[in-house]
């Protein structure tokens, strides 16, 4: 597996690539969700490379080996779509996009903003949702009032980070248990 860095503006993006560079097929680009990395796509990379596709998986900005800008404003869907378009350019300028979880809105948005670069989109677990009359966070506050909703939990800067950093081993056990990979 090859690993490259793609630069978009002042952000470096880590990308894993498998499959023949001279594939007759359009390349596939996989975009992960939360809390994942491009590594999450390793089995799909091996499978599609075995079928003769050039396939890549990026670490979205803020994750893994990609840069992590501090400013919240650095994480708009437009910027994430721009990152995805930059990786598509590095793969040859046009690609098929796979997106899972948070990666699905990223690939849908990339297709809308950079339609000349996107041949097809597979959005896994999250359908395309057009912009509504109410901003998402306002709607989530209404729908989940008085209930835990993880996306709302992460909105106030520093709260979740402090809780996670207080006991990283306990957090790791929770995630391993939820994934079915708990060893204790």
Regions found by a protein language model. Give the residues of each.
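Solvent-exposed, non-membrane alpha-helical residues enriched in polar/charged side chains
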Residues: 3-4, 46, 85, 89
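Flexible "cap/lid" subdomain of the alpha/beta-hydrolase fold that forms the substrate-access gate
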Residues: 12-13, 19-21, 27, 63-98, ...
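N-terminal cap/lid segment of alpha/beta-hydrolase-fold proteins
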Residues: 1-12
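Conserved HGGG/HGGXW glycine-rich cap/lid loop of the alpha/beta-hydrolase fold
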Residues: 16-68, 100
């Amino acid at each position: 597996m090859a690993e490259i860095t793609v630069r978009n503006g002042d952000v470096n993006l880590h990308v894993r690539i498998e499959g023949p560079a001279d594939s007759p097929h359009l390349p596939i680009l996989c975009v992960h969700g939360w809390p994942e990395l491009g590594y999450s796509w390793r089995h799909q990379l091996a499978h599609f490379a075995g079928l003769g596709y050039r396939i890549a998986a990026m670490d979205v900005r803020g994750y893994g080996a990609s840069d992590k800008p501090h400013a919240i404003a650095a994480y708009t869907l437009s910027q994430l779509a721009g990152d995805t378009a930059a990786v598509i350019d590095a793969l040859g300028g046009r690609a098929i996009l796979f997106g899972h979880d948070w990666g699905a809105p990223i690939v849908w948005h990339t297709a809308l903003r950079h339609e000349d670069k996107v041949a097809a989109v597979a959005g896994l677990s999250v359908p395309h949702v057009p912009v509504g009359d109410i901003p998402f966070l306002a709607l989530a506050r209404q729908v989940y009032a008085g209930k835990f909703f993880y996306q709302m939990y992460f909105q106030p800067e520093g709260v979740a980070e402090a809780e996670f950093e207080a006991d990283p081993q306990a957090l790791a056990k929770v995630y391993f248990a939820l994934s079915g990979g708990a060893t204790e």
